[in-house]
Amino acid sequence: MSSNYAKMEISMKKMVSNISHDLKTPLTVVLGYIEMLHLDPAMQADERERMLGKVYVKTQETLGLIHDFFDLAKLESGDQDMPMTRILMNERCGKTILAYYDILAEQGYLVHIEIPDQPIYGFGNDEALHRVLNNLISNSIQYGNHGKQLGLTLREDESSVYVDIWDRGKGIDAMHIDHVFERMYTLEDSRNKFYQGSGLGLTITKRLVESMGGSIHLRSKPYELTVFTVQLKKVHY
């Protein structure tokens, strides 16, 4: 018990330290641009607009980090309201991946979608599942750039439904696979840094899946195939 508490305390201290650093960095940049705008009232309009655009981007980045922190806090405290219902997985998966189709086509990705014709129902929260799939697809787009292939596969067995999100990008070395879902895992190339750059992305994804009574798994062979699999309970109708 004391050992687990000590590990949790160390993890929390590390998370607070990293969040403080991640907040300080964009805020310092924002303050720098504001100073420049303040000290140079005669600045050209196009240069002023460029700087204001950067201020906006950094402000959104900071806001995203704060949202991540509070989302994770809610999930881990059990305060997140998450009504569970039957989800038509075919529809949810199809709508989510198709929303990325233009981006993927523009970046030259080959997209593989395998969704069966027969209805497959899972038990979960549609909003949470939507966020999980968005997170994983965004992750694959960012880190699968090398292989230029991305796929979504929906499948089932007698008791569960499975969604595989895969890519052929740089992947994750075996020594890091067990750690990528940890809070604030800060390996330079870790995929846990993809979500708003906060180091909380895959942790939030995992907590959302677990809050729906499911599980998430990862297997990866760098530059060949990386697969995140979301498993939820199957609903028989």
Where are these regions (language model features)?
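Short conserved segment of the HATPase_c
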Residues: 172-184
